[in-house]
């Protein structure tokens, strides 16, 4: 794994969108979307962050919980905006069906937002079922043929936590591998690579040009993919403290693990920050699984994508240098 040898570390981060990139700086968040071969649409977005309302969430551990929630809120808002821009820039030549006309009459301009909300709700429900209840159910089935899995003592808790954790990681990797085979998602992953490369270029204090960005690494230690992988790994340890059948009810174990998600989130966030700031043997070991997963969630971008990423990061770089974490 390549060492992090950047000349400075910035707090600027971002996420890949549909034909675009969101960049978030300390004072400004902007969404840049390519709407035509020679046109990039730039629009600022904002939210009232949790730490701005409650100082508790500025403290270590708690800031990770707030950071995840705020990032999801911003990403959702940015995704909605990029989807709108992408639709506006696409000419629909086919005659809409009767069902499409009915939807348009009922929802009008809000149709895309309604569909996104429905998709988000279904996505969350699927994720909860797939990553919490399915692993627990499969372990219980396996207990019929694996003696070590039986009972509710310490050994059973250990094996159930390991079984569930490893299965979650496998399911997560399979999910992103399947996504990477879809044409639209391939382009999103390419934009993801452009985002990382551009941030690295800025941290290396090189001029933000397409050629300079191209030569940067697309694997960044402070990435949402790395955060997800770390959360899954930390979740294995957290699971050791949850009984196989809380109060004698096996169904409650995944419920308890969902309630304990903030703990995994807070620890994972702090580990990501440490890996981003320090480069030593310990941090490289911690960061390795996430960087490996980024080989799936990032792809080499083309020049047009890099141009979008450059415009996005330029828009959020503060003149006072308040984004610099260390140098």
Show the residue positions of the predicted features.
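Juxtamembrane "helix exit" motif at the C-terminal ends of alpha-helical transmembrane segments
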Residues: 124-150, 231-256, 269
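Hydrophobic alpha-helical transmembrane segments
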Residues: 155-169, 248-263
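Transmembrane alpha-helical segments and their cytosolic interface motifs
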Residues: 110-129, 216-241
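Alpha-helical transmembrane segments of polytopic integral membrane proteins
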Residues: 82, 131, 135, 139, ...
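Divalent-cation
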Residues: 1-90, 94
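Polar-ligand-bearing catalytic/cofactor-coordination segments
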Residues: 2-17, 21-23, 91, 150, ...
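Hydrophobic alpha-helical segments characteristic of transmembrane helices
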Residues: 92-146, 156-182
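Hydrophobic alpha-helical membrane-embedded segments
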Residues: 59-81, 164-189, 261-277
């Amino acid at each position: 794994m390549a060492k992090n040898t950047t000349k400075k570390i910035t707090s600027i981060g971002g996420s890949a969108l549909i034909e675009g990139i969101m960049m978030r700086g300390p004072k400004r968040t902007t969404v840049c979307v390519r709407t035509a071969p020679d046109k990039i649409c730039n629009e600022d977005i904002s939210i009232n962050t949790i730490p701005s309302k409650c100082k508790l969430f500025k403290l270590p551990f708690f800031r990770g919980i707030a950071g995840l929630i705020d990032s999801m809120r911003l990403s959702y808002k940015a995704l909605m905006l990029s989807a709108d821009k992408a639709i506006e820039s696409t000419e629909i030549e086919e005659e809409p069906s009767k069902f499409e006309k009915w939807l348009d009459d009922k929802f009008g301009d809000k149709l895309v937002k309604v569909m996104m909300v429905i998709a988000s709700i279904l996505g969350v429900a699927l994720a909860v079922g797939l990553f919490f209840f399915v692993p627990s159910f499969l372990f219980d089935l396996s207990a019929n043929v694996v003696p070590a899995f039986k009972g509710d003592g310490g050994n059973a808790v250990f094996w159930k936590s390991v079984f569930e954790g490893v299965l979650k990681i496998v399911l997560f990797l399979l999910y992103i591998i399947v996504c990477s085979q879809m044409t639209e998602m391939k382009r999103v992953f390419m934009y993801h690579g452009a985002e990382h490369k551009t941030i690295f270029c800025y941290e290396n204090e090189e001029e933000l040009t397409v050629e300079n960005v191209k030569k940067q690494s697309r694997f960044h230690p402070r990435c949402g993919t790395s955060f997800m992988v770390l959360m899954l790994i930390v979740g294995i340890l957290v699971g050791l403290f949850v009984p196989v059948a809380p109060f004698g009810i096996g169904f409650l174990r995944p419920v308890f693990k969902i309630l304990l998600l903030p703990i995994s989130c807070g620890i994972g966030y702090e580990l990501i920050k440490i890996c981003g700031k320090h480069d030593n043997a310990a941090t490289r070991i911690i960061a390795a699984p996430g960087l490996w997963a980024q080989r799936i969630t990032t792809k080499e971008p083309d020049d047009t994508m890099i141009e979008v990423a450059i415009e996005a990061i330029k828009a959020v770089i503060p003149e006072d240098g308040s984004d610099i974490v260390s140098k």
